[in-house]
Amino acid sequence: MEKIYKIIYSQWQKEVIAYIANKAKHKGKAASCVIKKGGFYPLFFFLNVVIVVIEKLITRNKQEAGDERMPKQSTTEVEKSVRTEDEIYHNIDILVNKSHEALAQMDDFSQEDVDKLCQVIEKVGEDNARYLAQMAVDETGRGKVEDKVTKNTYAAQTIWESMKDMKTVGVIEEDKQEGLMKIAEPIGVIAGVTPVTNPTSTVIFKAMIAMKSKNTIIFGFHPQAQKCCVETAKLIKEATVAAGAPENWIQWIEHPSLTATTALMNNPKVQIVLATGGPGMVKAAYSTGKPALGVGPGNGPSYIEKTADIEQSVNDIVLSKTFDNGMICASENSVVVDKEVYDQVKEAFLKRHCYFLKADEIKLFEEHFIDPRRGTVAGPMAGKSAVKIAEMCGVTVPADTQVIVAEYSGVGPKYPLSAEKLSPVFTLYKAENSAQAFKICTDLLNYGGRGHTAGIHTQNSKVIRKFAFAMSACRILVNSPAALGGIGGVYNNMMPSLTLGTGSYGANSVSHNITAKDLLNIKTVAMRRKPIL
């Protein structure tokens, strides 16, 4: 009982003091003033009474047991925890103020100035693609160096090529005949949140679109990828500042924590949040009360219809699932196959070193591969190789195994492997017909992937159209690997991006691949014309 009392006592004391201190800070008053004049006095008084009672219970317990091994938390320790949180908020304020100063210095930048600096970022990304890829793999223990080189190059070269002719400064469109003119202005200070799965490439991408739209950016890096992300941002900063950019147009949180990232996203002087991460982080971004562009979870299905080119379809899926060990969120998490070609598809996967789990091995994966609290892949397994994941789950597979496949029948909490996997693992379903295939794909999207991506392999244009209308996904990929198809610009003509909107399906504000234009305020000048009655 004493332990329970002490935990409650310590936690309440911290939270009450922190709550009042933060309220006082945001109101610009002393904590005592907030307690007396605000609406917190009754709550504070009540909790203090409770704390006193708990203190007495602890003391009495110790006297009865004669146990002095659990000293009370000192007032100094409590004050220190509050002060530390205050320091975090203060440091964020400093970063944001510096960012606004840089924003003002960029006010006179022309389209040519901005494009020149974007080209500098492109060169940094290309020249350091391998160095940063190796650093990311070494730090996070996830993915493949060669594939991260490709992603860094994509974030630099492909992204720049896609938007180099995009007008983002000043007058971007004028129609004299219609009497309309559009003027672009930067949104302001961006809070850029990055994931552990695609760390360095996301930094390059977000820095590029921030500069292209003449905004400043402050990054909150994932703690498990802090070093490689800081190095990426430093290289970009050094090169762009040398080329004429303001010193603080790009900054980052030096000591990452959930508190610091939350403080950044909620800072009143930050204009927009650009968040890439798990569903919790994206939800937090959308709860800030300001514009936010977030990326929801994937869990995308891929349907191999009976008229599909089997060899190409299987090649595409294996390529997609092995690329950076399946960490692009658009990659196939499940494959649904028409019964007429199921055996042929399975044989094709086996030829490409895909290991099919036995019934008892599926149970081991259900127990170890999926985090029961979150209902998705366990963190330590995301982005690991198929062989390593099997080992972690207690399953022995051949050393040349590329992908792990679980033949499955259901979707939802009772079928753990039907969730998002972010690794070279997928579930395989047999469908009696296209109607059942559509139903399975829809169920998979509804179980953690709404709005993201769905793929189909077929030669039947009518089926493609029906599939597109039926799926609650913002990207419908036809006859292509989903990982590289979803990001655009490689296997299709979608806008290249490393931030993929999922629309209202996934509680996102946009449904397309995010670009620099999403970071602009666009004003419309409308000339008078004769009124139409």
State what each model feature region is:
Residues 3-28:
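N-terminal, intrinsically disordered charge-dense segments
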Residues 67-72, 80-81, 107, 395-533:
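Conserved C-terminal structural/oligomerization subdomain of aldehyde/semialdehyde dehydrogenase
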